[in-house]
Regions:
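FAD-site-proximal beta/loop scaffold in flavoenzymes
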Residues: 1-45, 139-148, 153
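Mid-to-C-terminal Rossmann-like scaffold of FAD/NAD(P)H-dependent oxidoreductases
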Residues: 19-125, 178-188
Length: 189
């Protein structure tokens, strides 16, 4: 059991990774998170404390990625398996390939809450910025090309995803053109 500085109840004894349980986890985070990203972030935080710069553990928005055989899986923000109001989901699945996305959003405010992707790699920094700035699901969907992190020459699915999104929401949103300025500077308009 650790506090926000990863300190146990014993002087100068710390715990990180899945060996630690947060006494007061951040909103939307679990008290134990057994993924390597959180272990790495805890290690970076503890290194600051051990070198004289006491720092609280602040993991930010939930994210994770994994690979199931040849299928990439990524999640950013919170996407409930069974959403409860006011959370709603937009879902798109490719008819022939192992590619799908689920966008979670607040049905009242349209605030983007999170995304799960299968077969599509996403750009962490941009998605985190969209979440931190509490952008709408509409802003997120128009930024799909910039958020995509698949290697060059991979298939892209943004146009097909946007087509279904516009049909489902009765909107006429256009994709923002991929911009290295947006990608490198994390500028979301």
């Amino acid at each position: 059991l650790v506090n926000k500085y990863l300190e146990t109840n014993q002087n100068s004894i710390y715990a990180i990774g899945d060996c630690s349980e947060q006494q007061e986890p951040q909103t939307g985070r679990r008290s134990i998170e057994a993924v390597w990203y959180t272990g790495r972030m805890m290690g970076e935080t503890l290194a600051q404390t051990l070198t004289g710069n006491k720092k609280a553990y602040n993991p930010g928005h939930w994210f994770n990625s994994a690979k199931f055989f040849d299928i990439e899986y990524q999640t950013y923000g919170l996407v409930a398996a069974q959403p409860t109001k006011p959370e709603k989901h937009f879902h798109w699945k490719h008819p022939n390939e192992n590619v799908a996305i689920t966008l979670a959003y607040d049905e009242n405010t349209k605030k983007f809450l999170g995304i799960n992707t299968f077969g599509i790699r996403m750009r962490h920094e941009l998605l985190d910025k969209i979440l931190c700035e509490k952008k709408s699901v509409f802003c997120m969907i128009e930024q799909l090309a910039n958020c995509n992190f698949d290697p060059e020459f991979f298939k892209t699915y943004e146009k097909k995803i946007l087509l279904k999104f516009n049909q489902d929401f009765n909107t006429n949103i256009k994709l923002k053109k991929k911009s290295w300025k947006v990608i490198f500077n994390n500028i979301i308009s």
